[in-house]
Amino acid sequence: MKSNNNPKAMVVERYTITDRIAHTVHAIAMIVLIITGLKIYAGWEFMSFHTARTLHMIAVPFLLAVNWILIPYNIFSEGHGLMGKISHFTDHYIFGPKDAVRLGGIIKNFFRKGRYPAYSIYDEEKGHYETKLHPVMKVLIVLEGTALFLITVSGIVLYKLDWSLFGLPIAQWIISISGMIAPTFGMTPVGFLRLLHLLMTYWFIFELVVHVGILGFDPHVWKYYKAIFWSGKEDFSDPYYSEYVEKYSRFDAKKEHKQVNANKEHGHQKH
């Protein structure tokens, strides 16, 4: 990371207020759903079944609204024009070749070979992040989206076997599709959906452990928790896992050009 004489210039907005709201609501709703869901399944006695089911059903719309409305809005409100928005989405949330290189560097660092690569990179010239997520998080995002879809689909049937939307028999359609898969495992369609719902719950628990317990175990990443839950800011004077690419000014270009010419003249003098 280059030096900067103005430390304030190196403090940038990492998360908007809507980003922070989305993440906080997502976290609370997910924790409530995991606890109440396991209570309903296992029959724990710390709360009544009625209370657990009520809290579960209250948390569901919050989780879905955040993930299927607010988060997509936050993502695609960045960037200019259609291609700019697509570029922002792929650079920030899709695991690509550069992320593979960073992940390779992270693995090497684990075995004490090389420096831990920066994964939060801000370009001052462009005025936005080039990337801000850990490579592993980009993989988890895709898996979480898939798990969220599956747990929602299976949850519809567990909520009400004949649930419909605008007269469309959604639950029955889900049961019919499940009926094509369930016999392979010697299960009924509803039994298969119940197992799928439970497995996706375990997945979210695993993801929570990886996200908070492992990736967040390093004290140097705690600055990102402060940013996502409170300040929204990232201070690039802290060099851990971050890089601030400074603006390449005309003065820098002239200085570099003069240096190149001086080197050439020095070379000619030698000859």
Swiss-Prot record:
Single GO biological process annotation from the record: respiratory electron transport chain
Any GO molecular function: oxidoreductase activity
EC number of the protein: 1.12.98.3
Transmembrane helix listed as a keyword: yes
Keywords: Cell membrane, Electron transport, Heme, Iron, Membrane, Metal-binding, Methanogenesis, Oxidoreductase, Transmembrane, Transmembrane helix, Transport
Catalytic function, reaction form: methanophenazine + H2 = dihydromethanophenazine
Membrane topology designation: Multi-pass membrane protein
Residue ranges crossing the lipid bilayer per the database entry: 27-47, 57-77, 139-159, 165-185, 195-215
Induction: Expressed in methanol-grown cells.
Subcellular location, record wording: Cell membrane
InterPro entries: Di-haem_cyt_TM (IPR016174)
A Gene Ontology term for the protein's cellular component: plasma membrane
Cofactor(s) for this UniProt protein: heme b
Physiological role: Part of the F420 non-reducing hydrogenase I complex that catalyzes the reduction of methanophenazine to dihydromethanophenazine.
Subunit relationships: Composed of a large subunit (VhoA), a small subunit (VhoG) and a cytochrome subunit (VhoC).
Family designation: Belongs to the HupC/HyaC/HydC family.
UniProt name for this protein: F420 non-reducing hydrogenase I cytochrome subunit
